[in-house]
């Protein structure tokens, strides 16, 4: 109220999540725009809402994060992957043997893994993930908060196929 927002607001918590998700999907199918706002920081980072974002993504709707102080949290909040336990690994080593060793260690580690990679090495990273973890859920977040913001979701193989089909994906951050 003190912000002057007069839109309809709904609560979302573990006791009403299933019903709210369906209600929100119905609103989206009617063409309405929805905002997920939290009174506890960035939504989905140790906060309710992951099942909602996953359902919205799986239904084919676009999720656009509002940027915070970190690209990692911005990407994670809209990825549609579990956020109750995640590990940020930063950039992997450039050297192939060290890189494969690090990726092999991630194979059996629990939680969502967040990696940074340069545009010039992203294809190689996806190929290595495809080789070591062909069934892993992958989200490639690029150009966050920019005009060409993109989230590719699927296996590494599926992301590679999408990446190969669009020259714009090979540019930017």
Residue ranges and their predicted role:
Residues 32-33, 112, 116-173:
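A contiguous loop/helix-start segment that scaffolds small-molecule binding in enzyme catalytic cores
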């Amino acid at each position: 109220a003190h912000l002057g927002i007069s839109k309809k607001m709904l609560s979302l918590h573990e006791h009403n999540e299933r019903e709210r998700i369906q209600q929100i999907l119905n609103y989206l199918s009617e063409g309405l725009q929805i905002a997920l706002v939290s009174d506890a920081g960035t939504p989905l980072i140790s906060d309710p809402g992951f099942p909602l974002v996953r359902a919205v993504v799986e239904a084919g709707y676009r999720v656009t994060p509002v940027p915070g102080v970190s690209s990692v949290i911005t990407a994670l909040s809209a990825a549609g992957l579990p956020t109750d336990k995640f590990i940020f690994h930063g950039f992997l080593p450039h050297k192939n043997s060290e890189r494969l060793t690090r990726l092999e260690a991630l194979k059996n580690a629990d939680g969502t893994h967040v990696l940074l990679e340069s545009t010039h090495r992203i294809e190689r990273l996806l190929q290595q993930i495809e080789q070591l973890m062909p069934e892993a859920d992958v989200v490639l977040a690029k150009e966050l908060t920019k005009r060409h913001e993109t989230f590719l979701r699927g296996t590494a193989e599926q992301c590679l196929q999408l990446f190969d089909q669009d020259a714009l994906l090979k540019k930017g951050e």
